[in-house]
Amino acid sequence: MPKNVWWLAIALALFTTGNAIVLSVAVVIGEKLSVDPTYSTVPLLSQYIGLIMATIPIAYLMQKYSRKLGFILGSFSGMIGAILSIVGIIYYNLTYFSIGLFFTGIAIGTAQQFRFAALEEAPKALHAKAVGLVMSGGIAAALIGPTLAVMTQRFFTEYPFAGPFSALTLIYVIALFYY
């Protein structure tokens, strides 16, 4: 298997770990930040809107310029989103938190392209194995993400749940080195 496919698998694992962190804590944070519990899922909705809005444009951008540029933009979007989410948590502001999750959604939408990048990196005979390897990064992330969210939840005692988004920022920084 080409070395780049392994790097793509690690990068997808990082992005998916970030998604698992968000899924683990977003609604709980939304409930704490909203005046009305009815709005507690708005941040998660915002993330999915970001994902949906990013998927097709990022695919075109990667096709026209390069996959690397798209993945770098995805990482930066994730970092911006995680930082805005932290600001929302610190200032008890549902709007900032929701906008932050919109940007993490863009990052997750970008991550959908890793499997296609694996196809470009692997010889035709190894396409199925390459996609399988890259997608297996999501299995590791399903375990690591929620665990990391719990472990970092009280990282900043004054601001519960700022820790997971600090970890998320670091994850997106690390992901920059894997494509």
Residue ranges and their predicted role:
Residues 3, 87-99:
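Helix-loop junctions at membrane interfaces in 12-TM secondary transporters
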Residues 150, 169-179:
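C-terminal membrane-cytosol helix-exit motif in multi-pass small-molecule transporters
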Residues 129-149:
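Glycine-rich segments within core transmembrane alpha-helices of 12-TM secondary carriers
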Residues 76-91:
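C-terminal ends and interior cores of transmembrane alpha-helices
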